[in-house]
Amino acid sequence: MNYRTILLLVGWVITLTACHSSPSSVLKKAMQMENVSVDSIFFYLQQIDKPENLSSKEQGDYYFLSYKATLWKTGKPVESLLQTAIHRYMQNGQLSQCLQARIAQSASYLYSNQPDSTLLISDNLLRQQLLNDTLRTQLYGLKRVVYSRNQNYGQALNMADSSRWLTRKNKDTLAYFSASRLYLNLLKKVQKIQVKSTC
């Protein structure tokens, strides 16, 4: 081979590799689309042919993002994606991500009409020391929904009050307004029930 052929071959290889993004960079782009567009998330995730080529830490993010995008698109949780994400997060000591995935798992049991499982996981997670107030508020919200569905409005009211207190503590005005509205609606229900029971 002559010098010119070698240069042409090297240029061709560089062009091919430059056009193909690494799985890690594609995953980052997909994660940036999380609050933008579900279709965009799928567009990027489908470009990752083999998730096993991602680092073990990135695999957790890949499966968790796949789970969320599928849930948002279809309205149905795919438990296997979530289990894989939780496993990867635990394997790599990614405790914060693991907590978020476990909260999603608790919510998925609610979608699957398994309220006792939602309560069990939520109670277990509420004992975690690494839990921040935002995640704690999400868990109180899940428990509130379960108690409301079971018509245990007193407990639902307690959960709504806990959420309201945390959002006020964090000075999150919008979240506080939302939590207060839920609290007041539940309070009205409890008061109606009390009036009916005294009549």
Q: What is each PLM-predicted segment?
A:
Residues 2-5, 11, 16-199:
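A "functional boundary" signal
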